[in-house]
Amino acid sequence: TRRSSDLLSTRYLSFPIDKPYQAFAGRDARLSAMVLFPGQNFGSTKIIIQGGLVKADGSGYHYRTQASEKGQDGLIYYTYGAEKSTEYSGFDPTLGHYTRSGFLFKKFLQIESPVEQAWSKGTQPWIDFRYGEILLNYAEAVIEKTTSTSAEKQAAQDALNAVRKRAAHKDDIALTQANVRKERFVELAFENKRRWDLSRWRTFHKEFENRVRKGLVPFLDLRTNPAHYVFVRV
C-alpha cells in the first residue's frame, strides 16, 4: 500500500467501472483491431486488466500487490479486478503471462475459434508480405527518391491514403516522410517490420537509447460511488 497522493496527485479523467475501454474511444480504427482494451470482451469472455486500487477513504492505494478493499457501495474490490488469478489478465508480478502494458494482443487472432493452451495448433500461414505493405513500400520509395516526378508523387500519395481509407479514415494526408513512417508504424504493427524500418532509416539508436517503456495502468478509484477507473502511466 502506498499513499494515493504520490501517484494520483494529478487530476485524471475518469471512466465508468463497467466500460473502462471508453478511454480509447475515437481513436484510429486500427488500434481496436490490433489490441484488446481493459473491460472489452474477447468472444464471450470479459478481459479484466487492472493494476491498482485506490482506497475509498483516499488514504492510500494498492499497486501490483494482491489486496482487497470495500467500496463506498459496500462491495469488495480487488487490486487486479478479480479475486482469482485465472480471472484477470494484467500486472500480477508473480507470474509471467500477465500484461505489463495495459493491453493484450489481438491482431491475427480468430475470436470465434476456441482457445487451446498448446503449441502448433494454428493453421493460418504466416503473412510475410501483404498488399498494404506494397502500397507503403511504394510511398516510401517515392518520397525518399530525390528525382521523383509529380506523377509518381501523386500515385504514392494515393497509395498512402488507400491504406488509411481501408481503415475508415475519410481525410487525405500529404505525402511526407513523417506521414509515410507513421503509417508504417501503425499499419504494420506486430508484423515484424518495425525493427527493420528503424534500421533502414538509421533511427534505431535514437528510438531505443535510454528509452524507458511505460504501461498504462487502470486504477479502480473507490473514492466515489459508483467507483470509476483512471489510467496512470507507470
Positions of PLM-derived features:
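Long, intrinsically disordered, low-complexity segments
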Residues: 2-5, 118-131, 160, 164, ...
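Alpha-helical solenoid repeat scaffolds, predominantly canonical TPR units
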Residues: 135, 152, 159-162
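Flexible, polar/acidic helix-loop-strand segments at domain edges
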Residues: 6-130
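Structural register within alpha-helical repeat arrays
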Residues: 131, 138-145
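Structural helix-adjacent loops and short alpha-helical linkers that scaffold large soluble proteins
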Residues: 146-155, 171
